[in-house]
């Protein structure tokens, strides 16, 4: 297994269809872990079996934690791989739901300079949230585990999720993007004054 043993959140998971169906013990590392501060390494062969295993580990961890995205450094693996999916229940704007997307060696290009500040949280900062400015529209591209290429132009929450996950590959956590740290705090405390959370 590619999941490393650290003292953070243990997740016991099985990912039928992406793996051999066996149980993997995996965890999501938290802010302060060195894997989250490093620039991740490019993947040389996206079709290699170890990348398929990594993706399976990531998918299981993301779904077990009920997240919408995960980057390989969040399970302490220094590879430029991100996954995300936004089901209809999590869509916050007129954009459609996003099916499971796997991007290896992703590249982002903003479309214009327009930015929007919105609420973000992260599986590596459990219980926390903050207001983060992000580009409103962008192009992204990346390679799939089958060796294909994904190219999309997206906006809204989809664009926010991609930017958040790709930041992890460069050692950036969302508080580092915030302009006003007074909007950063524990979700349960913020809910008392911001009911829309």
Locate predicted features.
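Positively charged
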Residues: 6-197
């Amino acid at each position: 297994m590619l999941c490393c043993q650290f003292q953070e959140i243990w997740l016991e998971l099985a990912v039928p269809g992406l793996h051999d169906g066996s149980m993997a013990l995996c965890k999501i590392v938290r802010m302060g872990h060195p894997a989250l501060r490093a620039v991740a390494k490019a993947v040389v062969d996206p079709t290699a079996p170890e990348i398929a295993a990594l993706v399976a580990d990531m998918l299981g961890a993301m779904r077990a934690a009920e997240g919408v995205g995960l980057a390989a450094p969040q399970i302490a693996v220094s590879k430029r791989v991100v996954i995300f999916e936004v089901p209809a229940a999590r869509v916050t704007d007129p954009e459609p739901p996003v099916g499971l997307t796997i991007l290896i060696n992703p590249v982002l290009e903003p479309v214009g300079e327009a930015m929007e500040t919105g609420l973000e949280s992260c599986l590596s900062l459990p219980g926390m949230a903050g207001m983060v400015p992000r580009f409103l529209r962008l192009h992204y591209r990346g390679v799939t585990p089958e060796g294909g290429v994904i190219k999309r132009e997206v906006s809204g929450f989809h664009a926010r999720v991609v930017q958040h996950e790709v930041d992890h590959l460069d050692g950036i956590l969302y508080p580092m993007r915030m302009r006003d740290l007074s909007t950063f705090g524990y979700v349960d405390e913020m809910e008392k004054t911001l009911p829309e959370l």
